[in-house]
UniProtKB/Swiss-Prot annotation:
Subunit organization: Monomer.
Keywords recorded for this protein, A-Z: Cytoplasmic vesicle, Endosome, Lipid-binding, Membrane, Protein transport, Transport
Protein's organism: Mus musculus (Mouse)
Name of the featured protein: Sorting nexin-21
Keyword Iron in annotation: no
Name of the encoding gene: Snx21
Amino acid sequence: MASRLLHRLRHALASDGPGEAAAGPEAEQFPESSELEDDDAEGLSSRLSGTLSFTSAEDDPDDEDEDDEAGLDSPPSGDGASGEDAERSPPPDGQRSSQLLARQLQDFWKKSRNTLVPQRLLFEVTSANVVKDPPSKYVLYTLAVMGPGPPDRQPAQISRRYSDFERLHRNLQRQFRGPMSAISFPRKRLRRNFTAETIARRSRAFEQFLGHLQAVPELRQAPDLQDFFVLPELRRAQSLTCTGLYREALALWANAWQLQTQLGTPSGPDRPLLTLAGLAVCHQELEDPGEARACSEKALQLLGDKRPHPFLAPFLEAHVRLSWRLGLDKRQSEAQLQALQEAGLTSTPPPSLKELLIKEVLD
């Protein structure tokens, strides 16, 4: 589409140049400007803004999308032009104008990606498995959650079933009728729920559904959306930690921390601290005191100078103990912990991070 657009613009520029014949009756009846405004401009703006559609693969193949975007990135060279194009090629001034216009289109496209579509998360269904858990049977969709950062960084992942997505959609519809009215969601089916075609279409629909939610600030900050991403991971990580499966729990805590970092909005006042507590406990139990201390230090930075928090004394105690074990300075944390104890704001000794994890109720 972009190549056709540039092709028409070249002829429009050429027609203004000297020695070019006047446009015939057919050109007057169907001026190129009207075609551009009515058809191509709308399609171009939708592609530039990154708008997602729920069209099927037959109607809107991914290959065509990639070709169109490539056409905007790299204008077609004259080597590939047909004989007819060569006969109608504009004079050098027209070529320069066309190249300038192509550069302007590229700049507009790049600017549109930065302004119309702010940096946000991308979602990709990497696998979809049919799970048989008698008497129920369902499809478990695993999504990669990708955000800004080093390209070699492993993306965070979540695994959800249709009922999880449906519950999120229903809750958001109840709270945000206006914004949600423009967001589509795949309907329930009475039959053929486990065919490859249905699973593929739903996978694409779920990717777009989450992408649209992330594009609306009001929805992006909704507690229900935060819970959808983070809460199941935290519950599983907490359960594994309490049963002593620290290596398995560590992977879930790390994934939950990455999700919260990428979401960029608070997923609850205590959840980042709880996640850091889980990471610190698992690293400590797996004989990695350096990482455990780093997690405690990060938590103390998050707590800052706020009023005493239930997690403050346990993190201070862990930081003092780990610093002593590593031969690092512990005086500041030690003095702060002693001040809390003298003020009667915590017990002596304070509860451990593991005790807090066991007692914490995630809802």
